[in-house]
Structure formats: structure tokens, C-alpha cells
């Protein structure tokens, strides 16, 4: 959702040297991801109650979005419910398929 995407943008902008923003038109035909700003990378966000489903489904969608965007890399950010004493940003996980990870480290 919008709130989670804004949160992810703020965290990535804080923790990386890049200015990350929400992509206009996310979710439309030929989707190219939810966020922009990390070079050559498609970023998909998921803030689902069923985080296991998000971990399985969203990286597959991110891969199609990577192809649509003609980018080299795709990552999925999955937001988990904050736990007590959770550090700033620690309720997010970066998820990739094995193929996506292999492409990243080549």
C-alpha cells in the first residue's frame, strides 16, 4: 500500500546514497516496479498480512517487472509487523529468488 511504499522509500533513501521515490503508474500493465531510484534495479514492495505468500509471489512479479523495465536487478521488500523493541527499519526484509540473487553477485 501507499503508506508502506512511502516508508520503504524513506528507509532506502536513509540507508543508501540514493533518493528513492514511488513510481507513478505502479500496478498498471507493463508494470516496472513500485519504487525508483536505485540504478538498474526494479523494487517491488509488499505489505501483506500473509507475509509467507508475499515472499513467494512478489519476487516472481518483480522478475517480470525487471524484464518490463529492461533492468538488470529485481528485489522485493516485504514489510513485517513491528515487534516490541524493533530497530528502525528492522521489520523489512529484502527477498529475491535464487536466480535474482545470482544475477546480483555475478
Where are these regions (language model features)?
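Catalytic phosphate/metal-binding cores of nucleic-acid and nucleotide-processing enzymes, i.e., regions
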Residues: 1-106
